[in-house]
């Protein structure tokens, strides 16, 4: 969050500088006469064409006259404004279209094509599942009732996927789209007023941002001074960056979780078959965890985007595009600050969703967390370098546990010092910087045998 704060502060300073420079160009009366003549020539196309023709016919005498200079600048500014408006309209239209329709549909089609390529693997897993189930039934072993239910469900799901993959995939895609549409659809406020959904709000905001950037680009084109035009373009770039960042982040929270859920549900039967193998059940647990995480992000992100979009639309004034012409400083600051604030509020949703996901995992699967390599090595390192309790050493006496030799020498100290961090030993081993920690020696926990204190008779000293 510190990096985001620095970025927000830099954007705020840039908004202040650009808006102040643009405001100075608006309030400066020294360039009013030249700017007015250029604007008049831009509006009067017939007079401008006459002046340009006269200047081109007699370039030696009329090239340096103010009328020729103003006519050329008016034509260049008009061409520049047309190019800027066309590029801005095309950029925002392409962005809105890609985020609204093209990108999700293409990704869903790619997921369907990927899952269809796995159909031979599904056939193989279906055959293996049927053979294992038949062998378990013929072996006449006592199985719990839930085992039969689980195997029956697995056989039904995998067989349906293998026999009709297109129907299964179309059902998954349609179901995820219905859930996403219900979450991002219109909602009703507490006072009974109906609000607009997340996607509709994004479409409206994209149109507003396009109008803002077009207004600033038009001001840059209308300004005859190149320095002031650069300031106007800087304001347009700041507004476009902040609004585009909000649009991209909000659209990603609306689209990406649904695509991940579609992919995980499409590959779900392959992970369900792994429940038959105890050594591979952790993969199924990882699949379930990823599915729950994607569902949590879908359930929290989509309503949050709709709510923040509605709040942002209500906070922005109605005549903001017209204010850019008279007060660019406050208008640029207002638009950029509101967009950046909404973006930061969406970014704070990520740790919240992670906390909810962790709580759900602890509640639903308390024993699903498998101790990985890092945890196993941490436990081994803690056992290896743990000091011996004083009470146990005193109770054992001079006899070391597991040996029958009476020796009062203490146990040798470990060759390596204890790591400063629990995962240090595993990290060194994983990175190849140290050998694997030796396994813990199994010691005999039986008590040491009591010494034989019986008095044996002396043998007589015979001559």
Swiss-Prot record:
One Pfam family linked to the record: TrbL
Tagged with keyword Membrane: yes
Biased composition (Basic and acidic residues): 441-455
Membrane topology note: Multi-pass membrane protein
Claim: Secreted is one of the keywords in the record: no
Biased composition (Pro residues): 411-420
One cellular component (GO) term of this entry: plasma membrane
UniProt entry keywords in alphabetical sequence: Cell membrane, Membrane, Signal, Transmembrane, Transmembrane helix
Subcellular location field: Cell membrane
One GO BP: protein secretion by the type IV secretion system
Residue ranges of the TM segments: 118-138, 232-252, 253-273, 294-314, 333-353
Signal peptide region: 1-24
Top-level taxon of the source organism: Bacteria
InterPro entries reported for this sequence: Conjugal_tfr_TrbL/VirB6 (IPR007688)
Ranges of Low complexity composition bias in the record: 376-410
Segments for region (Disordered): 376-463
Protein name: Type IV secretion system protein PtlD homolog
